[in-house]
């Protein structure tokens, strides 16, 4: 509950660099917030995937392993995150500002009625004072990104809704292993409990009509 989550992009059976960069940043954010870092891997043939992930300081790795989850398609992966997040109630979710992240992020944030900031170049933790409402919010995610054609840098906060979601550009954050022997929990989920059959794309084959 209220942890930092990172969605892992899987290229075959390899975790994408942008996701490993986000694990590094996610670990730092979790330390600041005094919470755990969790990651979500959805794909096929993911046995041993934890060896790539846990050394970055991941406390819990959620694994969804099924043939219908690779290659990536929108609906199954959206259902994985939406239904998992309803259970786990994360305070932050990070994913790469990639073709997949730009498709998946808005779907998940819309379903959960949470905010999403795209193409962030920096993430920090800080407070926000809403003078109009007379409220001060602590430990918010500062989602920092270029705006107005890159002429200014905007800092965006989401005080009311969770999770605070952001996509982050590849290569703007360092990828650093925390501890090669880091011990985290691996949770293997039953995909059928999260993804309805109707989400999967079915490829239908038809035989040509016989010639007269």
Regions found by a protein language model. Name each.
Residues 1-207, 211:
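N-terminal glycine-rich FAD/FM-binding segment characteristic of electron-transfer flavoproteins
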């Amino acid at each position: 509950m209220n942890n930092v989550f990172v969605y892992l992009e899987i290229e075959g059976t390899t975790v994408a660099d942008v996701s490993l960069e986000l694990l590094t940043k996610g670990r730092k954010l979790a330390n600041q917030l005094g919470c755990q870092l969790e990651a979500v891997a959805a794909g096929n043939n993911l046995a041993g995937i934890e060896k790539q992930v846990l050394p970055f300081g991941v406390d819990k790795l959620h694994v969804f392993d099924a043939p219908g989850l690779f290659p990536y398609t929108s609906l199954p992966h959206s259902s994985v995150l939406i239904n998992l997040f309803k259970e786990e109630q994360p305070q932050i979710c990070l994913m790469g500002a990639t073709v997949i992240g730009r498709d998946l992020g808005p779907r998940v944030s819309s379903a959960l009625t949470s905010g999403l900031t795209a193409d962030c170049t920096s993430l920090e933790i800080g407070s926000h004072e809403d003078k109009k409402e007379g409220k001060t919010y602590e430990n918010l995610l500062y989602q920092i990104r270029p705006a107005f054609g890159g002429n200014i840098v905007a800092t965006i906060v989401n005080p009311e809704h969770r999770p605070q979601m952001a996509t982050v550009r590849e290569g703007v954050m360092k990828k650093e292993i925390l501890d090669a022997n880091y011990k985290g929990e691996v949770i293997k989920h039953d995909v059928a409990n999260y993804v309805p059959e109707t989400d999967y794309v079915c490829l239908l084959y038809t035989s040509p009509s016989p010639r007269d």
